[in-house]
Regions:
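Hydrophobic or amphipathic alpha-helical targeting/insertion segments
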Residues: 1-5, 179, 183-185, 192-194
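Extracellular glycan-modifying ectodomains
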Residues: 1-71, 78-79, 84-85, 89
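Short, structured coil segments at secondary-structure junctions
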Residues: 9-11, 146-147, 192-194
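Short, conserved active-site loop motifs that form the nucleotide-linked donor/cofactor pocket
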Residues: 13, 148-149, 176
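The substrate-binding groove and active-site-proximal loops of carbohydrate-active enzymes
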Residues: 39-46, 91-100, 172
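Alpha-helical substrate-recognition element adjacent to the catalytic core
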Residues: 69-71, 75-160
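Short, surface-exposed basic-aromatic patches at helix termini and helix-loop junctions that form
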Residues: 136-140, 168-170, 190-194
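Conserved Lys-Pro-Asp/Glu-containing loop-to-beta segment of HAD-superfamily phosphomonoesterases
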Residues: 162-183, 189
Length: 194
């Protein structure tokens, strides 16, 4: 319901998903009648900090203090398998397989982020021709090549590609969020681009 509401609201209206926050604590913990009657405070003292943090994230985003571009790996990140080894037809994505359904749901989430203004980019160690193939021949792909503002599929170190992406988009490295299934790649990026 909140996702649908968020999709239908004008761009200048932002939703603080209190339902999701309260579910983390339970409604008995979230709401305290004493605080409501004393100060008309809808959140218990115990749950006030997460409520304020979530509100601060929304306000921060309004003032440009948030990530602008989500940079994602491809293999075992938006589809199951390695396209260079398994070929596009051998990748796991889509209905009928729990793993494939999870990758499809992740792609749907990424597309929602794009529709809300988050830029999407690819940074993958692959030959570009192999990396592009699933976008062309797999109808289960929710994301299309056109959804990405930058597409780096090569064998350069990922920190180098991330620098290039930031430069192309004219944004700082601190405006990038990097998503990769490989802990070694994440650590390499973390070490080289602190």
């Amino acid at each position: 319901l909140n996702r649908e509401l968020g999709d239908r609201l004008p761009a200048y209206v932002h939703v603080n998903d209190v339902e999701s926050l309260s579910a983390n604590y339970g409604l008995m913990e979230w709401f305290d009648l004493r605080f409501w009657f004393h100060a008309k405070q809808p959140v218990s003292f115990k749950c006030l900090l997460p409520y304020v943090r979530n509100t601060a994230r929304i306000v921060g985003a309004l003032f440009g203090c948030s990530a602008k571009c989500l940079v994602i790996d491809l293999d075992n990140t938006i589809w199951g398998g390695v396209v260079g080894d398994d070929g596009p037809a051998g990748l796991v994505i889509g209905e009928g397989n729990p793993v494939g359904e999870a990758f499809k749901a992740f792609q749907q989430y990424l597309l929602q982020l794009k529709q809300r203004g988050v830029l999407l980019a690819v940074c993958s160690k692959n030959d570009e021709i192999n990396a592009l193939a699933p976008f062309k021949i797999r109808p289960e792909m929710v994301l299309k090549r056109e959804d990405f503002v930058s597409f780096k599929a090569n064998w350069l170190p990922k920190p180098e590609n991330l620098r290039e992406i930031a430069s192309e988009l004219n944004i700082g490295l601190n405006a990038l969020v990097f998503v990769d299934d490989n802990p070694a790649e994440r650590e390499h990026v973390r070490f080289n681009l602190p």
